[in-house]
UniProtKB/Swiss-Prot annotation:
The gene is pgk. This is Phosphoglycerate kinase. One of its GO terms (molecular function) is phosphoglycerate kinase activity. Substrate binds at D23, F24, N25, R38, H61, M62, G63, K64, R122, R155. It comes from Clostridium botulinum (strain 657 / Type Ba4). ATP binds at K206, G297, E328, G354, G355, D356, S357. Its EC number is 2.7.2.3. One of its GO terms (cellular component) is cytosol. Belongs to the phosphoglycerate kinase family. Monomer. It is found in: Cytoplasm. CDD domains: Phosphoglycerate_kinase. The keyword ATP-binding applies. Signal peptide: none annotated.
Length: 398
């Protein structure tokens, strides 16, 4: 995939109507935004376009309204908060059909530097099916398209891909540019040693990632629930731990592939276990890889955490996707904390692949110590799998 895409700085936007696909899919509680990270992330692109005298038309989805208007998924709270953040009124075009009379009038009345926000794009059932009718309507409002929503770049929707069939100028915003720089470099030309850490519950979610990364990394670290399927593949007992029986054979193949490729594949050598999945369960540390009958693994053990941390400390590039244990339970958060600490203390390029690992790093307060925290869980995974992301492929090459 070609990651060398035109950015907003490569196009002349003065006086032009610029449709910007943002990721404003933020959590709401009683109409109040509870996590503003995605709004903050969008500001550099919006401010640049304002300074350059563009007419800025923002669009985004929120949640899953499934093709019909749902008041609780309206982008009105986003318009209000953005107005405060930008010190400028963001006009909210509240049309149930997204591109309706309000939107058309608001866009018609725009002056250079003005900002309009359209209603939730997923109010339209055509959006997720990438149907031409809605793509055309969105494109009819603008002269130029800018995609700055990495979180949905792996989806071919009207507002990420369809509009580019009708707007010949299509570039990426600063957020996507940053994602492409860090993730692209890690996958294409990493500074070595290159260490990747994969955690989370399921091997099946990460099958292609494991396979693709074994062709690229020097060390691959496996933790979290998926570690137990690998332990079983090595012939250890895993008690009542999470296991995907149908992936044991695949795990064996990956262990063999790592040997063939000369990749250092690190798997748990001890575990923190309990007799039930409960935040108040008493943690027990196993002596080795084996987990006794009646117990389930809920975190990597201290010896494993030390080995993983040492591998991270010797790296020049580290990519991490997925926690090492049930980090929501204090007794089983230590593995994730140790990995996060090792990355925070490292001089390497450290990249967090969105989703649960990003949440863990931010909750633990290590966010500022990482080189890059990806804004897209699913998108960053597909990127690490080596897949082409349709929302990026659709943009103009440099």
């Amino acid at each position: 995939m070609n990651y060398n895409k035109k950015s907003i700085e490569d196009i002349d936007v003065k006086g032009k109507k610029v449709l910007v696909r943002c990721d404003f899919n933020v959590p709401l509680n009683e109409g109040k935004i509870t996590d503003e990270n995605r709004l903050v992330g969008a500001l550099p692109t919006i401010k640049y376009l304002m300074e350059k005298g563009a007419k800025i038309i923002l669009c985004s989805h929120m949640g899953k309204p499934k093709g019909e208007p749902k008041k609780e998924l309206s982008l009105l709270p986003v318009a209000k908060r953005l107005s405060e953040m930008l010190n400028k009124e963001v006009i909210f075009a509240d049309d149930d059909n997204v591109v309706g009379e309000n939107a058309k009038k608001a866009v018609e009345d725009m002056k250079d530097g003005d900002v309009v926000l359209l209603q939730n794009t997923r109010y339209r059932k055509e959006e997720t099916k990438n149907e031409e009718v809605f793509s055309k309507e969105l494109a009819s409002l603008a002269d130029v398209f800018v995609n700055d929503a990495f979180g949905t770049a792996h989806r071919a929707h009207c507002s990420t891909v369809g509009v580019t069939n009708y707007l010949k100028e299509a570039a990426c915003g600063y957020l996507i540019q940053k994602e492409l720089k860090f993730l692209g470099n890690a996958v294409e030309k990493p500074e070595r040693p290159f260490v990747a850490i994969l955690g989370g519950a399921k091997v099946s979610d990460k099958i292609n990632v494991i396979n693709n990364l074994l062709d690229k990394v020097d060390t691959l670290i496996i933790g979290g629930g998926m570690g137990y399927t690998f332990l079983k593949a090595q012939g250890y007992t895993i008690g009542n731990s999470l296991v995907e029986e149908d992936k044991v054979e695949y795990s064996k193949e990956m262990i063999d592939k790592a040997k063939e490729k000369g990749v250092n594949l690190l798997l748990p050598i001890d575990n923190v276990v309990a007799d039930k999945f409960d935040k108040d369960a008493s943690p027990v540390v196993t002596e080795d890889q084996n987990i006794g009958e009646g117990y389930m693994g809920l975190d990597i053990g201290p010896k494993t955490a030390k080995i993983y941390s040492d591998a991270i400390k010797s790296a020049k590039t580290v990519v991490w996707n997925g926690p090492m244990g049930v980090f929501e339970f204090k007794s089983f958060a230590n593995g994730t904390i140790e990995v996060a600490k090792a990355m925070a203390d490292s001089d390497a390029v450290t990249i967090i692949g969105g989703g649960d690992s990003a949440a863990a790093v931010n909750i633990l307060g290590f966010g500022d110590n990482m080189t890059h925290i990806s804004t897209g869980g699913g998108a960053s995974l597909e990127f690490l799998e080596g897949k082409e992301l349709p929302g990026i492929a659709a943009l103009n090459d440099k």
